[in-house]
């Protein structure tokens, strides 16, 4: 699927389809966001300027902001951002895809960027493009937390709810090209430091 197809499917998704815990209960869904915000806080410096790329309705962005982070919530779907604003009207939101992030930031860079349940839906080429744009939005030495799974049998998703996986070598090559250095972490997602590419 192209990035445009993934974005369109995401924008049209029923709220109950965007996360499996929402089918359990709304409380379980929002509690999972609080738990993930706490995990992110273990690797992101206190009070940092943070971008949640692909924030959806704010499941993680809202509790991370409540922990004292300066969160900018970015999503390609205005419908998702409207749902977020209903719960947290003071949270900064930006409607943009990866290509639109730079125009919002201008010369500013974030201390940290995270993308959870975003990259898994995209092709290899689109994922590399997105990660490159997120790296460019991050200060040198900043932190990126990416839900970017590896597998012994990597493959590209064939639908927007599929999961694209990478080999360790594919990821290592991408990191060297983009300017990411893997950081040891207990998190269930990859944690990277923004370094010079090459």
Residue ranges and their predicted role:
Residues 114:
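A conserved beta-strand element that flanks and buttresses the S-adenosyl-L-methionine
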Residues 117-118:
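Short catalytic micro-motifs in class I SAM-dependent methyltransferases
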Residues 108:
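Active-site charged/polar residues at nucleotide-handling catalytic sites that mediate phosphoryl
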Residues 53:
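Conserved beta-strand/loop positions that form the S-adenosyl-L-methionine
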């Amino acid at each position: 699927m192209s990035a445009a197809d993934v974005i369109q499917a995401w924008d049209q998704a029923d709220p109950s389809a965007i996360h499996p815990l929402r089918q359990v209960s709304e409380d379980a869904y929002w509690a999972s966001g609080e738990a993930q915000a706490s995990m992110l806080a273990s690797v992101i410096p206190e009070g940092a300027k943070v971008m949640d790329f692909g924030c959806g309705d704010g499941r993680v962005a809202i509790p991370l902001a409540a922990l004292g982070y300066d969160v900018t919530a970015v999503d390609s779907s205005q419908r998702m951002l409207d749902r977020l604003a209903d719960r947290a009207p003071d949270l900064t939101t930006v409607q943009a895809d990866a290509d639109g992030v730079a125009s919002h930031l201008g010369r500013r860079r974030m201390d940290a960027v995270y993308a959870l349940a975003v990259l898994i839906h995209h092709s290899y080429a689109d994922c590399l493009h997105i990660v490159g744009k997120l790296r460019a939005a991050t200060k040198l030495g900043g932190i990126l937390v990416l839900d970017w799974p590896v597998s012994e049998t990597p493959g590209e998703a064939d639908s927007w709810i599929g999961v694209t996986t990478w080999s360790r070598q594919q990821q290592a090559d991408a990191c060297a090209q983009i300017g990411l250095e893997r950081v040891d972490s207990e998190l269930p997602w990859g944690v990277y430091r923004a370094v010079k590419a090459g």
